[in-house]
Amino acid sequence: RDAECARYAGLLQRYPVDIVCMGIGENGHIAFNDPDVADFNDPKLVKVVALDPVCRQQQVNEQCFERLDLVPSEALTLTVPALLRGRWLFCIVPFASKAEAVRCTLYGEISEHCPASVLRNEADACLYLTAESARLLPAE
């Protein structure tokens, strides 16, 4: 695992990413940076993380896996700093189940408790929402 993280990080160093397409998880995660493991100042580009129960259940809810016992308990993920190195950040967020995470992203404290909140610091980040995922946002 460490060797694969190092290999992947080397590729990211050698071939910098211009466009990052990501989503926001039900717990506010970006990539697999769940609230318990997200680090806005992580020195690594890629790391192995333990997936929290909310994230694992989301994989089943979104039909990525048939059952919870089939969802891995660990994953390789780009770290928050690695994601933010992209020149353009596009975040696509469907589903009503993510409405609270979207609200926290846009109106909550910028902190690792809602990793997606860091996107508010990025001038080139674009958030694409559905009516369902935006349902808890104030009307403008």
Located regions from the model:
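Conserved phosphate- and dinucleotide-binding cores of soluble alpha/beta proteins
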Residues: 1-140
